[in-house]
Amino acid sequence: MSSEKFTSISPAEFFKRNPELAGFSNPARALYQTVRELVENALDATDVHNILPSIKIIIELVDPQKQIYKVNVEDNGIGIPPHIVPNAFGKVLYSSKYVLRQTRGMYGLGVKAAVLYSQMYQERPVEVVTSPINSKRIYFFKLKIDVVKNEPIILQKTSVVNEKNWHGTSVTLYLYADWQRAKQKIYEYVKKTYIISPYAEFFFKDPDNNVIYYKRLTDKIPEPPKEVKPHPYGVDIELIKFMIVKKDKPVPVRDFLINEFQSIGDVTADKILEMAKLPKDKKTTELTDEEISRLVEVMKKFDDFRPPSAEALSVIGEDLIKLGLKSIFNPEFAEAITRKPKAYQGHPFIVEAGIAYGGAIQPSPEPIVLRYANKIPLIYDEKSDVIWKVVTEEMDWKRYGIEEEQPPLVVMVHLCSTKVPYRSAGKESIADVEEIEKEIKLALMDVARKLKKYITEKRKEEEAKKRLITYLKYIPEVSRGLALFLVGGDKQKIGDAYSDLREKLLKIALNKLEVNDKKLEEEIRNYKVEEL
């Protein structure tokens, strides 16, 4: 009987064999995913560093026979140090995003998965042009990934003098793609990205030479997230071991707890060590696996920790959400809310919600749902997302004044967290987590109450208008009768008296019915009735 042969493969080879795990399941999805990964990197290189983003996206068909497209995304961000570029684009699971703060990316995979997919169907390398802020040179790279070794292959590296003090990054990828099937999703992605980042400007040119430009509407950038220490509720045995190894030298376990974790001070550290039956002065490198396991178990069950710090999070903010919704949908009503920070499994999170109603919004059987996670629009896998579930199944919109069978309603939800519970590495839908689901519903209820108040007031005004119009029908007849009486029946003199009486009676009607809406009042004044 022959024996099985065991081998290992590199992370690069694993994702080359399984591109669908990173969202590259077919030529259409691959094109969308490439644009998305490059735009996310561009935004993280700009707004996180308080730079107003200017992002250019160009897609060109360069080989019609083989369906090879060229994708270029350029930003005005902080740039990439030249010694970092090869690994940033040529080493899978190498990233600046393995930190405890909110980032758009989280796996160190995105752009490398695009490079791997690119290599599978054509021979051109990824091209990177970058210049860090205050750099005197602009650097040019052509790279591929050594799939077996998971290492970058540098095909070309040059630099030129930075005469115009440009800073930022431009990335060009060539890939086998299907523009016609990806077109709608890419346009949707760019539009939805702009909705929550109206402080950015986007230039987009597609393979059909169509150009769209979203202009910057404000200079207000959300407060960027800060890196924080781990919260005790989010630890596990391997994390503790990793943190111990990462320390330059052994330290007493008490000092380790106080200095390496948030929410642990002197008193709390003493309580934890007492419950875990560990001496305060024992060195971290002397801890056995059983002692580390005990320590983690106590930290998980300890009740007196403060909630995780929300400093690691960056919300969009109510003003920017409303601005984005108004600019794209032109509604008659737009409101938003940002909830207070909550936590799940030791990770802080914040839910934001926005609603736009009426105006230019097209009626539809179900609300138009805009889903976001860490400022990323989620386009695919809508029905499997907890946001969709809450909006369409758990919210009774009729309770909030929406009675239409096909309401003109847009519902936006944004979840930001140091760890978004995505259902897969493709980052397209959020899993059902009880704490998050509850906060989404509470956020929607909060903003829906504002919508109900608006709809109620609007209906009152419409009823007032109907009643006033009823009165108006009698004003000409009453005015003419009184005018004739005042001028002694002389129809030649009735004109001025009639106009004066008609205006006075109209004012009485407006005041009596408490019409305070100037627009409505003007509409009523211009209302034409048949004068008897």
Curated annotation (Swiss-Prot):
SUPFAM superfamilies: ATPase domain of HSP90 chaperone/DNA topoisomerase II/histidine kinase (SSF55874), Ribosomal protein S5 domain 2-like (SSF54211), S13-like H2TH domain (SSF46946)
EC number: 5.6.2.2
Top EC class, one word: isomerase
Residues binding ATP, per UniProt: N41, D75, S96, K97, G105, M106, Y107, G108, L109, G110, V111, K112, K427
Function comment: Relaxes both positive and negative superturns and exhibits a strong decatenase activity.
Species assigned in the record: Sulfurisphaera tokodaii (strain DSM 16993 / JCM 10545 / NBRC 100140 / 7)
Subunit note: Homodimer. Heterotetramer of two Top6A and two Top6B chains.
CDD domains membership: TopoIIB_Trans (cd00823)
Disulfide bonds: none
Family statement: Belongs to the TOP6B family.
UniProt key word DNA-binding: yes
Top-level lineage group: Archaea
Alphabetized GO MF terms: ATP binding; DNA binding; DNA topoisomerase type II (double strand cut, ATP-hydrolyzing) activity
One GO biological process term: DNA topological change
Keywords: ATP-binding, DNA-binding, Isomerase, Nucleotide-binding, Topoisomerase
Residues passing through the membrane, by range: none
Alphabetized PANTHER family for the sequence: DNA TOPOISOMERASE 6 SUBUNIT B
Name under which the protein is recorded: Type 2 DNA topoisomerase 6 subunit B
InterPro entries noted in UniProt: HATPase_C_sf (IPR036890), Ribosomal_Su5_D2-typ_SF (IPR020568), Ribosomal_uS13-like_H2TH (IPR010979), Ribsml_uS5_D2-typ_fold_subgr (IPR014721), TopoVI_B (IPR005734), TopoVI_B_transducer (IPR015320)
Reaction(s) catalysed by this chain's protein: ATP-dependent breakage, passage and rejoining of double-stranded DNA
